[in-house]
Amino acid sequence: VSAIWLSGAHAFCPVPSGLTPVAVQRVVDGDTLRLSDGRSVRMIGLNTPEMGKQGRSDEPFAVAARKRLEALVAASDGRVGLLPGKESKDHYGRTLAHVYGADGSNLEAQMLAEGLGFQVAVAPNVDLVGCQQAAERSARQAGLGLWRQSPVLKAEQISTSGFAVLSGRVSKVQRNRGGVWIELQDSVVLRVAPNLLGQFDVAQLEKLKGRQIEARGWVVDRSRRGGLKSGQARWLLPLTDPSMLQMTP
């Protein structure tokens, strides 16, 4: 099985040249590594379910994702290759990088293809979006891991901030100085910030009214900031790349 799988992993995201080999001290969770040199690495393009913190329980498949990444790192003799992102650090100070096993397989694509995480894209670190989407699609079509039971929420089911994949019908599209705002049945509003409009086909966004869409990203509760005006949707989902928004039949 592994030989067949490895050829598939390479097909999703081929190995690049010029990788920096590093030693892994431990796997923090399904998408984060701690290196022996003290750095934390957040894997680009992969978001795995959260481990429980501060009394919260683990999200489904959080432990499975961490254990699988531990096994992949162990199979690579505890050393991996890093390809840093165009943006090399996140706001927590973690190194942002694509991670490769000793055999050249992209570990984000491997996790996605096994249904142990969600494909995500945050500009400008979007070079592998296509192959990572393909890896996730194969898991989704096969009903693997977290796709066994659909994790997609209806827009009106959103009740907490954090990462979500949601679906809904577009009730309104508006463009102003704050960017493009796409409302889903008064429950959630998606936003494309002005600095990201160049990445999107804005004419297509403006035609979305009445269409059924699926979006993913990190939901923000606007009522907590006291900035919620009358008639505004409580939940805001900033779109960080066109791949985070799909039309559905």
Show where each model-derived region lies.
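Small beta-barrel nucleic-acid-binding modules, primarily SNase/OB-fold domains
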Residues: 2-249
